[in-house]
C-alpha cells in the first residue's frame, strides 16, 4: 500500500473511504476467523468413546456471502481468476465422486422407506437434488471458485455429521423407526450476479421403540449466507427392517472415507489459496513499494533541484559580495594614495619655502653687513675730521667735561644749556633698529644721514652756539640738524670735545598730557651757559639725595591677576624684578626726566614686555590719587623718558612697574619725588 507522503502518514481507519486493498485484507481476515471457529466447533461436538449418548442438537451454520464481482473488486480478482478456475475444476471433479456415493446410499434408504409409503405420493430422490446442486455449483465456480468450495464444504460437513451419528447409533435404534430427512436446497443464481447461495439441510430423526424409550432427536442444520432458512418438517416414515441395517453401516463407512478424502482435498486447496493470496499480497506490496520508490525518487529529484537553485543563489550572492569588497579595497587604496601624495606635496612645498627663506635671510644679512660697513666708515671719518680741532679752546673743553659728567651720573641724554638744544626721542617699534649718522664737512655745512635702524642715534654738534632740535612726527622718522654759528670757530672745537655721540630720549608719544617739543633759542655768551650748567647740577643731586617719607600718600594700585591659561607656562619662570628709578628736572624745555635700570638681572625671570609709569601730585583742591600716565615698550636697559606737560602742583611723586610677556606684574620701584611747578606746563 503506497503512502501518499513520507513525512506525513495517514492513520488507517475502517471507513467507506478505505482503499480496495485494505477492504480485501479485512474480508480475508474475517473469513479465516470463521473457518477457525467452525473447526473448533466440530472438534468439540465429536464424542470421545461413548457408544450411547443422550439426545443432542447439533447445529452448524456456515455463512458464505459471495457477491457478484463489483466494480471495486473486479480489479483485484482478475489477476488470480485463471489460476483459481483451473484448481477449482480439478477439485470439483474429485469432490463429485464422494458426493454421488453419499447420494446413492441415501437413495437406497429412500427406496426402502418409500416402499412402505402410499403410491400416490412421490418424492424426488435426494441424489438427483444433490447432483443437480453440485452441477450448478460447478457452473458457478467458473465465476467464483471460492463460492463453490464453500458449498461443497458445507455438504461434506453435513454428510460427515450424519455418518458420525449413524456410526454412534446402536443397531437397536436402527431397527426402529427411522425417519429420513428431506433435503431442500435453494440456490438462486442471477443472470449476471450471484448474490447469495443458501444450503439448508435439516435432519430430524425420531425413533420410538416399542419398549417405550424416548427417541433421540438429532438436528443438523447448515446455514450458508446472512439470511437463515426456516426449518421445514419432512415426512416421517416408520421402517422396521433388519436387512437395512447392514446397508446403512456400509454407507456410513463409505461416507466416512469420502469425508476424509474431502477434508484432505480441502486442506490442500486451502493451502493453495493461502499461497495464492500471499503471492497476490506480495505483488501488491511490491507494486506499492515501487510506487513509494517512484515517489521517493521524485521527491529526491525535487530536493536536488531545490539544492541546485539555492547553490546558484548563494554563488550569485557571493559574487556580489566579492565585487563590493573589491570596490571597497580599491577606494581605500585610492584614498591612501591621495593622502600620501598630499603629504609629499606638502614636504616639497616646505623644502621650497626653506629655500626661499634662506634666500631672504641671505639678503637681510647682506643688508646688515652693508649698514655695518657704512657705520664704520662714518665713525672713522668723524674721528679723522675732529682730531685736529680738539685743542683749539680750553673753555669749550671745560663745558664739554661738565656735560660728560652729568651724562655719566644720570645715565640719560641731556641737552647742554650752552647749546640750548633739547632732544626728544620716541620709539615706535622696538624691533626696528636704525642709526642716524651725521657727516661733517670742512666748510661747516649741515649734513644729515639716515639709515633703517631707528634705535641708535649719533649726534655731533659743530658749535656751542648751535641748537640741534629733534622732532618726532607720526611716521617715526627722526631728523638731526646741525647748524653753523656766526661767532667764532673756537666754539666748534668746544662742541666736538663734549663727545655727545649718543643721546637717547624715550618719551612715548601719546602719554597723558605729555607732548614732546623742541624749541630753539640761541645763546649769546659763554658765561650764561656756564652759569646754567652750574645751576642744573645741584638740582639733580638734591632730587636724588633727599630722603622723604611717603606715609601720607594713598596705597599703590593693585595689578590685575594673570590669566589662568598661562599658569602652566609660567611655572618655570619668575615674575619681573624691581627696577631702580631716578628723577631729574630740566629747564630748557621745562620738564622732568626719568631714568630706570636693574643692576643685577636674574636669568630665571621672564622677559619684560613693557614698563608702566604712575604719577601722584599734591593739590589743595584735589585729593592725592595715583594715576597711570603712560606705558613704554621695553628696550635694553637702562631706559629714560622726558615729561614736558604738567599741572600746577607743589610736589610730584613718581613710580615705575614692569610687566613680563606672560602678563605678570612685578613690584613697584621706590617712590621718587620732585618739587612741582607753580604754573601749568603745556
From Swiss-Prot:
UniProt KW keywords: Activator, Coiled coil, Nucleus, Phosphoprotein, Repeat, Repressor, Transcription, Transcription regulation
Alphabetical list of InterPro entries matching this protein: ATF7-int, ATF7IP_BD, Fn3_ATF7IP, FN3_dom
Phosphoserine PTM positions: 416, 488, 521
Keyword Transcription: yes
One Gene Ontology MF term: transcription coregulator activity
Keyword hit for Coiled coil: yes
Pfam family, one: fn3_4
GO biological process: regulation of DNA-templated transcription
Ranges where the record places region Disordered: 120-148, 418-491, 513-538
Compositionally biased spans, kind Polar residues: 137-148, 418-451, 462-490, 528-538
Parts forming coiled coils: 328-378
Top-rank taxon: Eukaryota
GO cellular component assignments: nucleus; transcription regulator complex
PANTHER family in UniProt: ACTIVATING TRANSCRIPTION FACTOR 7 INTERACTING PROTEIN, ACTIVATING TRANSCRIPTION FACTOR 7-INTERACTING PROTEIN 2
Quaternary organization: Interacts with MBD1, SETDB1 and SP1. Probably forms a complex with SETDB1 and MBD1.
Described function: Recruiter that couples transcriptional factors to general transcription apparatus and thereby modulates transcription regulation and chromatin formation. Can both act as an activator or a repressor depending on the context. Mediates MBD1-dependent transcriptional repression, probably by recruiting complexes containing SETDB1. The complex formed with MBD1 and SETDB1 represses transcription and probably couples DNA methylation and histone H3 'Lys-9' trimethylation (H3K9me3) activity.
The protein's name: Activating transcription factor 7-interacting protein 2
Organism: Homo sapiens
Highest classification ranks of the organism: Eukaryota, Metazoa, Chordata, Craniata, Vertebrata
Amino acid at each position: 500500500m503506497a503512502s501518499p507522503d513520507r513525512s506525513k502518514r495517514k492513520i488507517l481507519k475502517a471507513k467507506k473511504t478505505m482503499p480496495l486493498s485494505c477492504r480485501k485484507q479485512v474480508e480475508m481476515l474475517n473469513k479465516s476467523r470463521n473457518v477457525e471457529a467452525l473447526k473448533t466447533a466440530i472438534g468439540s461436538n465429536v464424542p470421545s468413546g461413548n457408544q450411547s449418548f443422550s439426545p443432542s442438537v447439533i447445529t452448524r451454520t456456515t455463512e458464505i456471502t459471495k457477491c457478484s464481482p463489483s466494480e471495486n473488486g473486479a480489479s483485484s480478482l482478475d489477476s488470480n481468476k485463471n489460476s483459481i478456475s483451473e484448481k477449482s475444476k480439478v477439485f470439483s471433479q474429485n469432490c463429485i465422486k464422494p458426493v454421488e456415493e453419499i447420494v446413492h446410499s441415501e437413495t437406497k434408504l429412500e427406496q426402502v422407506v418409500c416402499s412402505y409409503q402410499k403410491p400416490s405420493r412421490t418424492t424426488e430422490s435426494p441424489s438427483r437434488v444433490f447432483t443437480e446442486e453440485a452441477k450448478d455449483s460447478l457452473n458457478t465456480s467458473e465465476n467464483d471458485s471460492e463460492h463453490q468450495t464453500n458449498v461443497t464444504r458445507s455438504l461434506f460437513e453435513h454428510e460427515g455429521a450424519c455418518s458420525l451419528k449413524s456410526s454412534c447409533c446402536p443397531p437397536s435404534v436402527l431397527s426402529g423407526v427411522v425417519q429420513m430427512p428431506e433435503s431442500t436446497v435453494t440456490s438462486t443464481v442471477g443472470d449476471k450476479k450471484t448474490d447469495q447461495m443458501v444450503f439448508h439441510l435439516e435432519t430430524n430423526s425420531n425413533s420410538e421403540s416399542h419398549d417405550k424409550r424416548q427417541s433421540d432427536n438429532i438436528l443438523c442444520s447448515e446455514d450458508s449466507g446472512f439470511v437463515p432458512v426456516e426449518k421445514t418438517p419432512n415426512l416421517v416414515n416408520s421402517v422396521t427392517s433388519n436387512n437395512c441395517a447392514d446397508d446403512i453401516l456400509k454407507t456410513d463407512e463409505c461416507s466416512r472415507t469420502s469425508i476424509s478424502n474431502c477434508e484432505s482435498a480441502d486442506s490442500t486447496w486451502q493451502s493453495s489459496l493461502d499461497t495464492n493470496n500471499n503471492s497476490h499480497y506480495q505483488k501488491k506490496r511490491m507494486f506499492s513499494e515501487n510506487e513509494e520508490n517512484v515517489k521517493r525518487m521524485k521527491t529526491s529529484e525535487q530536493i536536488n533541484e531545490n539544492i541546485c537553485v539555492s547553490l546558484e543563489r548563494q554563488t550569485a550572492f557571493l559574487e556580489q559580495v566579492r565585487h563590493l569588497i573589491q570596490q571597497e579595497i580599491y577606494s581605500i587604496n585610492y584614498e591612501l594614495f591621495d593622502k600620501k601624495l598630499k603629504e609629499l606635496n606638502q614636504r616639497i612645498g616646505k623644502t621650497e619655502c626653506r629655500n626661499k627663506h634662506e634666500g631672504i635671510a641671505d639678503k637681510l644679512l647682506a643688508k646688515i653687513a652693508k649698514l655695518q660697513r657704512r657705520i664704520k666708515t662714518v665713525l672713522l671719518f668723524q674721528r679723522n675730521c675732529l682730531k685736529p680741532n680738539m685743542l683749539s679752546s680750553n673753555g669749550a673743553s671745560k663745558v664739554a667735561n661738565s656735560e660728560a659728567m652729568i651724562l655719566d651720573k644720570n645715565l640719560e641724554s641731556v641737552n647742554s644749556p650752552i647749546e640750548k638744544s633739547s632732544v626728544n626721542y620716541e620709539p615706535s617699534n622696538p624691533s626696528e633698529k636704525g642709526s642716524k649718522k651725521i657727516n661733517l664737512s670742512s666748510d661747516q655745512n649741515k649734513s644729515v644721514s639716515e639709515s633703517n635702524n631707528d634705535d641708535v642715534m649719533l649726534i655731533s654738534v659743530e658749535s656751542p652756539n648751535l641748537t640741534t632740535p629733534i622732532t618726532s612726527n607720526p611716521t617715526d622718522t627722526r631728523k638731526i640738524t646741525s647748524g653753523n654759528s656766526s661767532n667764532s670757530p673756537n666754539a666748534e672745537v668746544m662742541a666736538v670735545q663734549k663727545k655727545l655721540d649718543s643721546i637717547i630720549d624715550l618719551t612715548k608719544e601719546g602719554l597723558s598730557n605729555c607732548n614732546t617739543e623742541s624749541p630753539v633759542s640761541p645763546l649769546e655768551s659763554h658765561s650764561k651757559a656756564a652759569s646754567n650748567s652750574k645751576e642744573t647740577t645741584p638740582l639733580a643731586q638734591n632730587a636724588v639725595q633727599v630722603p622723604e617719607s611717603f606715609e601720607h600718600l594713598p596705597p599703590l594700585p593693585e595689578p590685575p591677576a594673570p590669566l589662568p591659561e598661562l599658569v602652566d607656562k609660567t611655572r618655570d619662570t619668575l615674575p619681573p624684578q624691581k627696577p631702580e628709578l631716578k628723577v631729574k628736572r630740566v629747564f630748557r624745555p621745562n620738564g622732568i626726566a626719568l631714568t630706570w635700570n636693574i643692576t643685577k638681572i636674574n636669568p630665571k625671570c621672564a622677559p619684560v614686555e613693557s614698563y608702566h609709569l604712575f604719577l601722584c601730585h599734591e593739590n589743595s583742591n584735589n585729593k592725592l590719587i595715583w594715576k597711570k600716565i603712560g606705558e613704554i615698550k621695553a628696550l635694553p636697559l637702562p631706559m629714560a623718558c622726558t615729561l614736558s606737560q604738567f599741572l600746577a602742583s607743589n610736589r610730584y611723586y613718581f613710580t615705575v612697574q614692569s610687566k613680563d610677556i606672560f602678563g605678570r606684574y612685578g613690584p613697584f620701584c621706590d617712590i621718587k619725588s620732585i618739587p612741582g611747578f607753580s604754573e601749568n606746563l603745556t
